[in-house]
A protein has these predicted regions:
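Short, compact, well-ordered microdomains
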Residues: 88-126
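A generic structural signal for short, non-catalytic loop/turn and secondary-structure boundary residues
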Residues: 10-13, 46, 93, 104
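Aromatic side chains
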Residues: 17, 51, 79, 109-110, ...
Length: 130
C-alpha cells in the first residue's frame, strides 16, 4: 500500500501532496501531538515507519506561485476548517507530516506548534521503509 502511494506520488505529472499521521499504538504514544523541540529533547526524530498516509491529492491550482510556506499554511487551514469529504484523518495537528511534490521537487514538513519544520531525508526513509 505505502509503496503504491509513494510511486504514484513521485511519478505524478502535476503537483500533489500527502498528509501523514501517526499510527495508533504504543510506539507512537509518547510522540503524538508533540512539538519538534520536544522530540529533540527526547532524542527522537519523526520516524516514517510510525506514519500512515491519510490523504493524497492534487495540489489546488491556486497554489501556483505560492511558496512552500504559504502552501503549507493553506493546507493547514483546509484540514482544520474545511476538510475534504474523503479525508479520513483527524484535523491537521502537531506531529503530522505534510509531503509536497511541487514542480518535481518533493519535501516533507513536520507540523510544529508554530509553522512547519522541513524534514530532510524523511522521504528517502519512507521509500526505504515501503
Amino acid at each position: 500500500m505505502m509503496q503504491d502511494v509513494l510511486d504514484r506520488f513521485l511519478a505524478a505529472e502535476s503537483d500533489v501532496y500527502l498528509i501523514l499521521q501517526l499510527k495508533d499504538g504504543p510506539e507512537t504514544a509518547d510522540v503524538r501531538f508533540e512539538s519538534f523541540a520536544r522530540l529533540e529533547q527526547m532524542g527522537k526524530v519523526p520516524n516514517p515507519d510510525h506514519y500512515e498516509v491519510v490523504y493524497f491529492a492534487n495540489t489546488p491550482a491556486y497554489f501556483y506561485g505560492m511558496s512552500n510556506a504559504e502552501a503549507l499554511e493553506e493546507l493547514y487551514l483546509t484540514f482544520n476548517l474545511k476538510r475534504p469529504a474523503d479525508f479520513r484523518g483527524h484535523s491537521l495537528s502537531v506531529s503530522d507530516v505534510v509531503v509536497l511534490n511541487r514542480e518535481g521537487k518533493a519535501g516533507a514538513f513536520y507540523v510544529d506548534r508554530i509553522g512547519f519544520k522541513e524534514q530532510p531525508g524523511f522521504l528517502e526513509q519512507m521509500k526505504e521503509a515501503a
